[in-house]
Amino acid sequence: MPHFIVECSDNIREEADLPGLFAKVNPTLAATGIFPLAGIRSRVHWVDTWQMADGQHDYASVHMTLKIGAGRSLESRQQAGEMLFELIKTHFAALMESRLLALSFEIEELHPTLNFKQNNVHALFK
């Protein structure tokens, strides 16, 4: 953990530069000191069928979720979230100026007991 998951409307696939966003998100999350680098995973789910608002324009949307394990303070989660959303807004600023675009971001804390995982990548970063 954490997992940074993007749901993005397919009409901005080229302009969104999600590999570029992920290249910024992963080290930013690691730099907080509360997320181990080996557990950070970023991915996108492209949405090819959607409707926004009245459906009368070429709207685009990007919804992002950061799924994290339980146990971090509200203050540290809020600081990480605010820092990450600033990075997100900067990444999408030019696109926001050129088209109708909705950005949203949330942090989801997973249940401390009902969260199962195994990862041998952590050993590479010890």
Curated annotation (Swiss-Prot):
**Cross-referenced InterPro entries:** 5-COMe_2-OHmuconate_Isoase, Tautomerase/MIF_sf
How does acidity or alkalinity (pH) affect activity? Optimum pH is 7.6.
In the record, what terms sit under GO molecular function? Answer: 5-carboxymethyl-2-hydroxymuconate delta-isomerase activity
Q: Its annotated pathway? A: Aromatic compound metabolism; 4-hydroxyphenylacetate degradation; pyruvate and succinate semialdehyde from 4-hydroxyphenylacetate: step 4/7
* One example of a Gene Ontology biological process annotation: catabolic process
Residues annotated as coiled-coil are none
Entry annotation: catalytic residues: P2
EC code: 5.3.3.10
PANTHER family attached here? 4-HYDROXYPHENYLACETATE CATABOLISM PROTEIN (PTHR37950:SF1)
What is the protein name for this chain? 5-carboxymethyl-2-hydroxymuconate Delta-isomerase
